[in-house]
Every structure is written in C-alpha cells, then in structure tokens.
Swiss-Prot record:
Ca(2+) 4 binds at D141, D143, D145, R147, E152. This protein has four functional calcium-binding sites. It comes from Mus musculus (Mouse). A lipid is attached at G2 (N-myristoyl glycine). Expressed in osteoblasts and bone marrow (at protein level). Expressed in the testis. Expressed in the sperm midpiece in a SPATA33-dependent manner (at protein level). Residues 131-136 are annotated as: Calcineurin A binding. This is Calcineurin subunit B type 2. The lineage of its organism: Eukaryota, Metazoa, Chordata, Craniata, Vertebrata. GO terms for cellular component: calcineurin complex; cytosol; mitochondrion; protein serine/threonine phosphatase complex; sperm flagellum; sperm midpiece; sperm mitochondrial sheath. GO terms for biological process: negative regulation of calcium ion import across plasma membrane; penetration of zona pellucida; positive regulation of calcineurin-NFAT signaling cascade; positive regulation of calcium ion import across plasma membrane. The record marks M118, N122 as: Interaction with PxVP motif in substrates of the catalytic subunit. Ca(2+) 3 binds at D100, D102, D104, E111.
C-alpha cells in the first residue's frame, strides 16, 4: 500500500493525513487475503454496501484500471468523492456514472433500464419499468436526442440536493466507514 501519509498530496483528495491513516486501517481490515486490493466479496463487507443493489456499479467506478478489484489508491480516490469537503460537481458526476454504464457521457434508455432494474429487482414487471424509463427520458431529455446528458441529469438532481447525502464520514476513534 505504500506510505499512507503521501496519499493526501499525491492524490489531491479531500482527506487529511489522519483520515487517510484511518481509511488505510479500514482498507486493511477489509482486505482479508492481504492482496493489497479489495475483491467484490471483500468490498461487500462494508455494512453500507451489503444491501446496496448498485454495489457492482460502485466497484466498477472505483476500479479505474478495470482489473476487477479496488486497490488502496483507487479506494482513496473513490471514497474521496464522498468526503464532506468534496464538491457538488464530483458527487453529481459519480451519481451520473452509476447510470452511464458505457461511460460515453450520456444515459441511454437501455442504461437507465438496467440500473433501475438493479434497484427494483422483480418488484416491477419489465414492461412497467420500461414505461417508467421512457417517461423519465421524455421528461429529462431537454434537447430531444433520446438520452440524458450530464447537464440534463444535474439540472434535476441538484434540486434534490443529493450531493449532500453522498458523504462518507471518517470519524475520530472509530475505524469504520460511515455513509
């Protein structure tokens, strides 16, 4: 993992050195096989993610090198987006990337369907979910191109103040992550 103290300046993240030290301790606790990276199974040990149907998408976004695991560098960069000191734009971009599965800068009808399906499971029939997706695209797609841009997404999500809910607290004296 290297010297945790160097990560603050190296990564331009929003954590101070003490927070990075505590995150390092949490990371090592999660890294059961001591490989220096977290598998999806190890990542799922975070209580906040155990019941989250989007955990796979979160890991995909954290895993910037695409190797299927999250190393300490990716862990710090990923969790830094949720720091109380993180800016609204970063949090909105993260939320957008949950839906933008192919990372092309737009949320398509199919991508919205896939992500919502992860969230609702079998609670809605596919045709009901598709109606919801179609209506959402119709309402959110201001330029009429059939997909949702980051700007269109942000216009709606900003009014919900979701960025204030996308926060990780690194508490003093407690080594667990809180979301």
């Amino acid at each position: 993992m290297g010297n945790e103290a160097s990560y603050q300046t190296e990564l331009c993240n929003h954590f101070d050195q003490e927070e990075i030290r505590r995150l390092g301790k949490s990371f090592r606790k999660l890294d059961l096989d001591k490989s220096g990276s977290l598998s999806i199974e190890e990542f799922m040990r975070l209580p906040e993610l155990q019941q989250n149907p989007l955990v796979g998408r979160v890991i995909d976004i954290f895993d910037t090198d695409g190797n299927g695991e999250v190393d300490f560098h990716e862990f710090i960069v990923g969790t830094s987006q949720f720091s109380v000191k993180g800016d609204e734009e970063q949090k909105l971009r993260f939320a957008f990337r949950i839906y933008d599965m192919d990372n092309d800068g737009f949320i398509s009808n199919g991508e919205l369907f896939q992500v919502l399906k992860m969230m609702v499971g079998n609670n809605l029939k596919d045709w009901q979910l598709q109606q919801l997706v179609d209506k959402s695209i119709l309402v959110l797609d201001k330029d009429g191109d059939g997909r949702i841009s980051f700007e269109e997404f942000s216009d709606v999500v900003k009014t919900m103040e979701i960025h204030k809910k996308l926060v990780v607290f690194v508490e003093h004296g407690q080594e667990d992550l809180k979301a």
